[in-house]
């Protein structure tokens, strides 16, 4: 797979935010739901240029991204989104593997995340375990799976 990874740039904020919305819409959510999560899925130029947001691209086209908040002993996978046209092609796996390696490189022993319920099976396939549920910041009453990866020493 000829995917290249690099830090996002501030001038890509709108493109990255649009990709996140299209990826979320892939799961068949209603327009009202998507409007409710729009702010949460909007990435500022500052976030994009912070170094915590990494894009996967092929031939200059962004196929997906992740944002890792590094910490020791625990890092947080704040987001991971794949362009709908690239879902099922290995891009998500490549992004996840890269994020977990980055967390391990800074000394994290675990990586936690709040997953979309539709994405929980994807993360479980790669070893994530559910450690609870957390309330959605955008949708009152909605609970999200709280997952954890235990990293090898």
Task: Please tell me what each predicted stretch does.
Residues 4-18:
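A short beta-loop-alpha structural element at the N-terminal edge
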Residues 17-43:
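Conserved GNAT-fold acetyl-CoA-binding loop/helix
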Residues 43-55, 76:
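A short helix-loop-beta-strand connector motif used in the catalytic cores of GNAT acetyltransferases and
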Residues 52-64:
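Conserved beta-hairpin
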Residues 61-69, 76-81:
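Conserved beta-strand in the GNAT
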Residues 86, 90-98:
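Conserved acetyl-CoA pyrophosphate-binding loop and the N-cap/start of the following alpha-helix
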Residues 109, 114-118, 126, 132, ...:
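C-terminal "cap" of GNAT-fold acetyltransferases
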Residues 123:
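Conserved active-site tyrosine of GNAT-family acetyltransferases
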